Regions:
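Unchanged
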Residues: 39-62, 73-127
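Small-residue-enriched segments and motifs
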Residues: 10, 61-64
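Nudix hydrolase/Nudix homology domain
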Residues: 30-31, 103-159
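Short loop/turn segments immediately following the C-termini of beta-strands
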Residues: 26
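A short gly/proline-enriched turn/hairpin at secondary-structure junctions
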Residues: 33-36
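Local beta-strand/beta-hairpin segments that build beta-sheet-rich folds
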Residues: 67-68
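Conserved N-terminal beta-strand and adjoining loop/helix that marks the start
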Residues: 1-21
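Conserved hydrophobic "DFG−1" position in protein kinase catalytic cores
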Residues: 14-15, 23, 88, 112
Length: 159
C-alpha cells in the first residue's frame, strides 16, 4: 500500500469575551467548521493557528490551551491529516476577514454563536450534508465530524 499524502493543520476554538465562539461557514460548500487550516512550510502549529484565525475571523488571539491533536485518514483518497487543536481567546477583532478567492467563491462567512448553538449548527450540518460542486459528502463529513468532536470534548471538560 502506498504511503498516504500527509497534511498538517492547526485549528480550534476561538472565544470572545462574551463567551461566543467562532464558526466558519462556507455556504456554497454546505460546510460549517471551526477556524483553522494547513501549516505552511516549516510553520509552527501555534503560529499557523494564529494566522488561520486572523484570516478566517479577523481576530488576533492568545492561545490559552492546547487540546492535543486529531488524526484523520481518508482511505478513498489515501490522505492523512494531523491537526493540532488549540483554544484561543480574542485579544483584538479587526472585523476584517482575509479569505482566499476560493473561500469567497465557496460563500465564506463568519458566525459567532454560543458553544451550544455552534454545536447544534455543526451537528445539523453533519446530519444533513449534501455534495456541492466543491466537495463530495465523503470529504466534507471528515471536516465537520472532526470539528463536532473537538467542540463536544471541549464543552464536556469546560462546562
Amino acid at each position: 500500500m502506498k504511503k498516504p499524502q500527509l497534511r498538517l493543520g492547526a485549528r480550534g476554538i476561538v472565544i470572545r469575551e462574551d463567551g461566543k465562539i467562532a464558526i466558519f461557514n462556507k455556504s456554497n460548500k454546505n460546510e460549517y467548521k471551526l477556524p483553522g487550516g494547513g501549516l505552511e512550510g516549516e510553520e509552527e502549529p501555534e503560529k499557523a493557528f494564529k494566522r488561520e484565525v486572523l484570516e478566517e475571523t479577523g481576530c488576533e488571539v492568545e492561545i490559552i490551551e492546547c487540546l492535543g491533536t486529531t488524526e484523520e485518514y481518508k482511505s478513498l483518497n489515501n490522505f492523512k491529516q494531523i491537526s493540532y487543536v488549540f483554544v484561543g481567546k480574542v485579544l483584538k477583532d479587526t472585523k476584517q476577514l482575509n479569505v482566499t478567492e476560493k473561500e469567497k467563491d465557496e460563500g465564506a462567512k463568519l458566525l459567532w454563536e454560543t458553544p451550544e448553538k455552534a454545536l447544534e449548527i455543526i451537528t445539523k450540518c453533519y446530519n444533513e450534508l449534501v455534495a456541492s460542486k466543491y466537495e463530495s459528502v465523503y470529504a466534507i463529513k471528515f471536516v465537520v465530524l472532526r470539528d463536532r468532536k473537538i467542540l463536544e470534548k471541549w464543552m464536556e471538560f469546560n462546562r
